[in-house]
């Protein structure tokens, strides 16, 4: 057993990997590759220690359970393969519908009977009366989504009005997927297509290796991810020109400049690694929201119907949680009443001596005078 522990390799962790990946899958979030390897190494060490602590008979049973797990993983692999084939099949069936949507949104074709309705007396009140297609379709759809609305700044909106279409596709080498954003000619950047690509360690589980975005070719003075600060020189200064400083600012277009894992991660401390992982998880969340929600249900987000559906689902979840909480509270109240009755029977009756003083948390002196924790702004 000791020799196996010294010669441990990540390839020996097949039994541990599905469990770690499943935990990430439940939250549908990505993790850092190197952090995952560290965890797997740790799991492997724990696995060896656990087996060494078992009696031979129990260890033999556990080894047999691991063989069963291996059989399960083989079946699971077939499931992933068949699921990918099924998704590819239906993706092809969706494509003609997405093409029709593109043509209508961008005014390439007109809906049958679209111009047959009699002109309304109040037609002049509608700003889009003479517009082609559906103006601001993708901008409105994305702004309606809670995750994406936090990313889209007011200064981004004029540029996103030129967004004509969003598509996604799987990639095989390396495994992952990409998002393509198609833009009409605009005064902000030269690119007609902005692409975001996600490389996955495992296509079937959301374990992110890295993300790559298109470098945006901004026109001079139009970079929405930067702001230029001008500071007047001090009085009496020889340099009369204002001092300019460029700062990075919040923008949806930062999505195309994703956080990167350094090539040499040995010098990264735990706090920096946690911060980087949080950034990558958030970036992945944005990408999957666009892929899984916005693209397939764009018109429902445009009209707001998708929000109502999500709110309804959240209400159902909250009601179930409230019911569970109510049951727990009732059980606790019953237990408290029983304990109070027993205490009343066992204690002699005394006159009230005023409200009891509660001990300070953590046993600290003068707990009442200590301020509550606050987050630094």
UniProtKB/Swiss-Prot annotation:
Residues found modified as Cysteine methyl ester: 374
Acidic residues composition-biased segments: 308-343
Residue ranges of the motif Nuclear export signal: 54-69
Annotated Pfam families: NAP (PF00956)
A GO molecular function held by the record: histone binding
Positions where lipid (S-farnesyl cysteine) attaches: 374
SUPFAM superfamilies: NAP-like
Propeptide boundaries: 375-377
Motif (Nuclear localization signal): 230-235, 347-351
Tissue: Highly expressed in tissues exhibiting active cell-division activities, such as root and shoot meristems and young flowers.
Keyword entries, A-Z: Chaperone, Coiled coil, Cytoplasm, Lipoprotein, Methylation, Nucleus, Prenylation
Ranges in a coiled coil: 33-87
Domain of life: Eukaryota
Subcellular localization(s) per the UniProt record: Nucleus; Cytoplasm
GO CC annotation: cytoplasm; nucleus
Mitochondrion listed as a keyword: no
Region (Disordered): 306-377
Compositionally biased region (Low complexity): 355-377
GO biological process per UniProt: double-strand break repair via homologous recombination; nucleosome assembly
PANTHER family in the record: TESTIS-SPECIFIC Y-ENCODED PROTEIN (PTHR11875)
Domain notes: The acidic domain is probably involved in the interaction with histones.
Homology family: Belongs to the nucleosome assembly protein (NAP) family.
UniProt function note: May modulate chromatin structure by regulation of nucleosome assembly/disassembly.
Record protein name field: Nucleosome assembly protein 1;1
Biological source species: Oryza sativa subsp. indica (Rice)
Species classification: Eukaryota, Viridiplantae, Streptophyta, Embryophyta, Tracheophyta
Gene designation per UniProt: NAP1;1
């Amino acid at each position: 057993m000791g020799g196996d522990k010294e010669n441990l390799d990540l390839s020996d962790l097949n039994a541990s990997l599905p469990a770690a990946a499943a935990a990430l899958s439940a939250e549908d979030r990505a993790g850092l590759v190197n952090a995952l390897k560290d965890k797997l190494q740790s799991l492997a060490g724990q696995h060896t220690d656990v087996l060494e602590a078992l009696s031979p008979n129990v260890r033999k049973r556990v080894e047999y359970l691991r063989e069963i797990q291996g059989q399960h993983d083989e079946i699971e692999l077939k499931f992933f393969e068949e699921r990918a084939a099924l998704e590819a099949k239906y993706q092809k069936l969706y494509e003609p519908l997405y093409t029709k949507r593109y043509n209508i949104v961008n005014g390439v074709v007109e809906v049958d009977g679209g111009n047959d309705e009699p002109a309304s007396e109040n037609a002049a009140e509608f700003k889009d009366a003479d517009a082609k297609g559906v103006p601001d379709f993708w901008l409105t759809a994305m702004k309606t989504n809670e995750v994406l609305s936090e990313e889209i700044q007011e200064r981004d909106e004029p540029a996103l009005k030129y967004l004509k279409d969003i598509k996604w596709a799987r990639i095989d080498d390396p495994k992952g997927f990409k998002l393509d954003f198609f833009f009409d000619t605009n005064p902000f950047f030269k690119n007609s297509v902005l692409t975001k690509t996600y490389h996955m360690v495992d296509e079937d589980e959301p374990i992110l290796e890295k993300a790559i975005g298109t470098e945006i070719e901004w026109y001079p003075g139009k970079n929405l991810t930067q702001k230029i600060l001008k500071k007047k020189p001090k009085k009496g200064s020889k340099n009369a020109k204002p001092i300019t400083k460029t700062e990075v600012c919040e923008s949806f277009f930062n999505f195309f400049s994703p956080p990167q894992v350094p090539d040499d991660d040995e010098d990264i401390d735990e706090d920096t690694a946690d911060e980087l992982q949080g950034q990558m998880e958030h970036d992945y969340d944005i990408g999957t929201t666009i892929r899984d929600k916005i693209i397939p249900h764009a018109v429902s987000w445009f009209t707001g119907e998708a929000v109502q559906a999500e709110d309804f689902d959240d209400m159902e979840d909250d009601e179930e949680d409230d019911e569970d909480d109510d049951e727990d509270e009732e059980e606790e109240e019953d237990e408290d009443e029983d304990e109070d009755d027993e205490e009343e029977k066992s204690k002699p009756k005394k006159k009230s001596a005023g409200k009891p003083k509660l001990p300070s948390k953590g046993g600290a002196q003068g707990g009442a005078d200590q301020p509550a924790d606050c987050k630094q702004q």
